[in-house]
Structure formats: C-alpha cells, structure tokens
Regions:
Chain A
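Core beta-strand elements of the Rossmann-like FAD/NAD(P) dinucleotide-binding domain
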Residues: 106-117, 260-270, 307
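Glycine-rich dinucleotide-binding loop and its adjacent helix/turn
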Residues: 124-161, 167-172, 294-302
C-alpha cells in the first residue's frame, strides 16, 4: 500500500489526507500544533472545549467532518505535536526528521519517515513591514491577534488599531470585536482606486468565489454595525510609547504607499495589529529541491505536483488564495499523491475551484500587494531585524561601506537576519531593500526550527548532524 | 490593564468552565486556566513583555503568536528558549525572564 505523508493539518493538509486515503493510500498526517485545523480553523484546545466554537469560524462543519473522518479511518495515522525539523534526500528519496512532543521540550520522540509520496501543506505566516516603534510591546502581527483571539480568547488590547494590507485585516478586526476589544480603525494601505481596479475588474470571474466574497461582505457589515471606520489609502507609520504602545501615527499614502506629508495624525491605542500580506513556509519544499515561482511560492502543475517527483504541494505555500482554495488544492494533491485518478468528478471539481482560486489570488495581489513607497516611512533608527536589533541606518551604512547589494553578505556584516528567527521576519524586507530578490534567497534554511543538542544526540547515528551551520549554545 | 481574556460568562464562544492553574513568573504567582499557553496566561493577566534583548535592553513579548518570530522566548522549569506562544502552561510551571536566546546561527 502506498504510504503518503502529509505535513500540515490546515485546510490544505486535511483535504489532502482525506483525498489520499479515499484514493487507497495509507496516510500519516503530521502537524506541529497539538490540534488540527491550521491557522484558519485555530480554536480552543480540547482541554478547554468551547460550546459554540462555530461563532468564530466559517465552514466549521467542514472542519469537524474532515477531522472526525480522518481520526476514525483505520488507514490514517494523525500525529499532533509533530515538528518536522528537517528533510533529507537519501538516494533521491525523501526522509523527514520529526520530533514529537511539547514544543521546544527536551526528550521528545524522534521519528524518521520515508514516504512513497509527500504532500507539503505547511501554510504561511503573515508579513509585517517594519516601521518606527514596531518593536514595542503592544505591536503585534495581525496573525498574532487572530491566533490569540481564536486559540486563547485573549484580546491583545482594549483600544486596538488594525493596519496593513489585504482582506485578512477584516477577519482580524471581527475576532477582536468578538473578544471584547474596541477596534479604533482598520487602515488599509491600498488606495480606493487600486482596490477598485483589482477587485472590480472582470467581475464575472468573481462569481465562482461567491463564498469568499460573502464572507468578506459579512465582515464589512460587522464593522459598520460596530461603527469601526475602514480607511483605504492609510497606514500606521509609527508606534509610540514608554516601554509599550500608547499611540500610533496614521498617515495617508500615495499610490506607491509613500506617506503624504502633512496628513499624519496621532491616534491613541494600547495595541496595534499589522500585516501586509503572507510569507509561505518554504523550508521543507526548498530542502526537497522544489522549484519556486518568481514570486517565491512553490511551483506546481495542474495536479499540484512540484518539480520534484514524489512531492506534491497545496495551500498557501503555493499562493495566497484563502481557505477554500487550500481545501480544493489539498483534494487534488492528495488524490494525485496517492496515485489516484485526478480526472474523477470530485478531483475535476476541485481542479476548477483551484483555477478560480488562482484568479482570486491574483486579485489580492493586484489590489493589496506591497508597493515600494513604504520605505520612505523608515528612519535611520528604525529596527529592521527584530532579533538582532539591526537598524535601517546600519543596513544602509553596510551597503555603502561594502558596496554590496547581496543579501547574504549584508546579513553577515550587519547581523540582520542572523538571529533565532532566521530572517523569517525581516528576510523579505532586507531583500527588497537591497533589490536582491532571486529565489530561493533567504528561504533556504537547513533547519525548520532550532533543535536542542540533546535531541540531535539521541538520533540514530546514520543521521548527519546539521550542526555545522548552527554551532553554538544549547540549541543548534 | 491592556491585553485580557474574554470573561467566560460573557463569551459568545462559550468555553468550558475555567480549571484554574498557577504559574510562577519571576517568583510571582500568575493565575490562568488549563489549556492556555504560557503567553496566553501572561497576556490574560495584562502582562505584555517578559524578555529583555541583550543589545538594546528592550522589552519583548508576543509578536507573531504562532511560533515564527522567537520574540516570546522564556525559561520554563530551568529550560531556556521555550516559545511561550506555543507551550501550554501547567500548574506550577516556573517561568523566568531570559535575555538573549542561546540559539545562534
Ligand atoms: C495566524 C494566522 C491566522 C489566520 N487566520 C485566518 C482567518 O481567520 N481567516 C482567513 O480567511 N484566513 C486566515 N489566515 C490565512 C490562512 O493562512 C489561510 O486561509 C489558511 O489557513 C491556509 O491553509 P493552509 O492549509 O495552506 O495552511 P495553514 O492553515 O497555515 O496550515 C499549515 C499547518 O502546517 C503546520 N506546519 C507547518 N510547518 C510544519 C512543520 N515543519 N512540521 C509540522 N507541521 C508544520 C502548521 O502547524 C499549520 O498547522 C490566517 C493566517 C495566519 C498566519
Ligand atoms: S510570538 Fe513569535 S514565536 Fe512566539
């Protein structure tokens, strides 16, 4: 029986696991989290179950059905708290190295899997462009506000400003309201003209994305009900406070996202949640050797196959198009990975949904995609790399002194991107500042997460220890 | 207080009743409920920073909330560099502020 391993139990991975087992494979579903659902269906844990979890979710029933079906199926093994920390290619095959147990704990169980087929569904994290004061406590990524609201029922502040770009800001504002916060305003960087051109162009194409459009319309109605202003063409360009956020500066932006002088105003707030789009979690795909698209997502064909035989990809690592798209792509990927027929009615319907989703993703990008003018809200003392506290001024100085625009060499000299997050927060920003955006760039990371030396030591000796690139300390 | 948890009796999501636990944070007891992460317990108690950067001496807490940014690292029961946003709190956990992470690239 063909063994399919699926990494990631968000919408894409759940759908892939189900499609693969239905196509006759034996399936192992791994997720680093201790529950299923990924980012979209993040919910209170089983130790604190909610009576009405669906209040915070769309298609909660779909999730329940998928989760129940997978857990009940004899040919499916669901492994939660399973962190895949590296991927190797012994003899052209694929080996996943996994640690199962408490996050960052010691003495986790080590697992090595060599599947016949691999589906990567590792999702994305949100991306925040730096601005003066963004390192203050009280500044969060919008994803953090969302994760804490859904997964903890915690509101990150009382008076909260939501800012950045993209449709994601709407569910974040909604969750904050449902968690008892006051949302002072939602500031979208895209100007109304750009948004209209992106969203209203060829409206017939949107008919297929009716579910998503309805979801977004619902959020807008909710903002209006709560009298939350939604302001296009604006950004939070600075956060202020003594030790934590007390206020932010909001400014109007031009088409290029450069602040328009004289439009700045101060807004009192104790939290600000900022997201300018998403960055795919590409480590495993890059380690497997999968080709990337010019915009740095995993390149896939109509059957979600990557450029590497035996490896499929689905969900937001292949493009940012929302949960419906992730579900459809997962269905296609799982079917194909199991060696099933992607011309069956279900797989073909999913395939059509994938094409609609790609059109939707293109609209998000054209309406909300990052425009270069944001750089003009940086100051020389603005932190660019949060880990190493490297400032914009220091990055510019290094470029001037060394004459290099190569991300690698600027990182080594300025230390930007060398801290524990391994440039996950600042990597794309650095590349844009330097104009050095060729793939895989900062996305090549030998380890998906730091692993403690003790865990490495307990692994079978056949394992090459990738410690060379991470030599010091308790963790590597 | 800034960050806080939605009171169970007003929560439209209707979470199960609280099952109290206490963690020690830099020697001070902080109350939480079973199922919260360490970051969840701290934020619900209105605490938003629990790490100090070594270069700038600046306070940090949660930034990404999903285990990607490593801003939220704490020492838990003597083990450094634990991401507070991922680790579920257990009654009696001893949480200590830490400086720079030991993980270096
Ligand atoms: C914090 C956050 C909150 C979001 N909330 C919403 C929302 O409310 N509404 C909305 O429309 N969109 C939301 N999004 C956008 C969201 O990413 C997508 O709509 C959807 O979740 C994408 O599905 P996916 O299956 O591709 O990936 P995800 O749902 O991100 O699932 C990926 C899964 O892979 C796991 N994983 C990744 N790497 C590894 C590894 N190495 N080892 C083991 N497991 C791994 C992760 O733990 C995760 O569970 C959110 C995004 C983020 C980052
Ligand atoms: S808040 Fe980013 S890793 Fe915990």
């Amino acid at each position: 029986m063909r063994h399919v391993v699926v990494v990631g139990a968000g919408p894409a991975g759940l759908a892939a696991a189900r499609a693969a087992v239905e196509a006759g494979a034996r399936v192992t579903l791994l997720d680093a989290g201790d529950g299923l659902g990924g980012q979209y269906w993040r919910h209170l844990p089983d130790t604190r179950p909610a009576g009405r979890e669906h209040v915070l979710h769309h298609r909660w029933e779909t999730f329940r059905e998928l989760g129940d079906a997978l857990r009940a199926h004899p040919a499916v093994t669901v492994v939660p708290s399973a962190q895949v920390w590296s991927l190797e290619r012994p003899g052209g095959g694929v080996r996943l190295n996994v640690l199962v147990g408490e996050p960052d704990g010691v003495g986790r169980d080590a697992l090595a899997l060599e599947p016949d087929a691999l589906v990567l569904a590792t999702g994305a994290h949100d991306r925040t462009l730096p601005f003066p004061g963004w390192q203050l406590p009280g500044v969060y990524s919008a994803g953090a506000a969302q994760a804490l609201a859904k997964g903890e029922r915690v509101a990150v502040g009382r008076r909260v400003v939501v800012a950045g770009a993209g449709p994601f800001l709407l569910p974040v504002a909604s969750s904050l309201l449902q968690t008892g916060a006051t949302v002072v305003g939602v500031h979208e960087a895209g100007r109304i003209g750009t948004l209209a051109r992106g969203w209203l162009n060829r409206p017939w194409e949107l008919a297929g994305a009716a579910g998503k459009a309805g979801e977004l319309a619902g959020y807008i109605a909710e903002l209006i009900r709560h009298r939350v202003p939604w302001r296009p063409g604006e950004a939070v360009v600075a956060a202020h406070g003594d030790g934590q956020v007390e206020s932010v500066t909001v400014a109007r932006l031009n088409e290029r996202w450069a602040p328009i002088p004289g439009t700045e105003r101060q807004v009192e707030a104790d939290a600000v949640c900022v997201s300018h789009g998403f960055t795919p979690r590409l480590e495993l795909a890059v380690a497997a050797g999968c080709a990337l698209t010019p915009s740095r997502f995993v390149m896939v064909d109509d059957a979600q196959a990557t450029s590497v035989p035996g490896v499929w990809a689905a969900g937001e690592i292949t493009g940012i198009a929302g949960a419906d798209a992730a579900l459809a792509e997962g269905t296609v990927a799982g079917t194909a990975a199991a060696g099933g027929d992607t011309r069956t009615a279900t797989a073909r319907a999913a395939g059509r949904a994938v094409s609609r989703a790609r059109a939707f993703a293109a609209r998000i990008e054209s309406a909300h995609g990052v425009r270069g003018g944001w750089v003009s809200w940086l100051r020389d003392d603005t932190v660019v790399c949060r880990c190493e506290e490297t400032t914009y001024g220091r990055v510019r100085e290094v470029v001037e002194l060394t004459g290099s625009h190569e991300t690698r060499s600027v990182k080594l000299t300025s230390r930007a991107g060398l801290g524990p997050c391994q440039a996950r927060m600042c990597g794309r920003t650095l590349e844009e500042l330097l104009g050095d955006t060729a793939p895989p760039g900062v996305d090549r990371r030998p380890l998906v997460v730091p692993v403690r030396l003790g865990d490495l030591a307990s692994l079978p000796s056949s394992h090459p220890h990738p410690t060379a690139s991470h030599p010091t300390g308790d963790q590597t | 207080m800034t960050s806080r948890r939605m009171p169970v009796d007003r929560d439209p999501v209707e979470p199960g009743p609280d099952r109290p636990l206490t963690i020690l944070v830099d020697g001070e007891p902080v109350a939480g409920t079973v199922g919260q992460t360490i970051a969840g317990v701290l934020l619900a108690a209105g605490r938003r920073e629990w790490r100090t950067t070594s270069a700038g001496g600046a306070p940090r807490g949660v930034f990404c909330g999903i285990g990607v940014c490593f801003d939220c690292l704490v020492d838990v029961n003597g083990l450094r560099d634990v991401r507070a946003c991922l680790r579920r709190a257990r009654d009696g956990d001893v949480v200590v502020r830490q400086g720079e992470p030991e993980v270096v690239a």
